[in-house]
Amino acid sequence: INWKKLGKALNALL
């Protein structure tokens, strides 16, 4: 699991 990618996706949603 790429946490960096998840973090970027979450930032985009937020």
Swiss-Prot record:
Keywords: Ion channel impairing toxin, Neurotoxin, Postsynaptic neurotoxin, Secreted, Toxin
A GO term, aspect molecular function: ion channel regulator activity
Protein's UniProt keywords contain Ion transport: no
Expression tissues: Expressed by the venom gland.
Domain of life of the organism encoding this protein: Eukaryota
Gene Ontology terms: cellular component: extracellular region; host cell postsynaptic membrane
Protein's cellular compartments: Secreted
Family: Belongs to the MCD family. Mastoparan subfamily.
Function: Toxin active in modulation of gamma-aminobutyric acid (GABA) neurotransmission. Increases GABA release and inhibits GABA uptake in synaptosomes from rat cerebral cortex. May acts on GABA transporters, since its action on GABA uptake and GABA release is not altered by the presence of calcium, sodium and potassium channel blockers. May also modulate GABA(A) receptors, since it significantly decreases GABA-binding in synaptic membranes from rat brain cortex.
UniProt protein name: Agelaiatoxin-8
Native species: Agelaia vicina (Wasp)
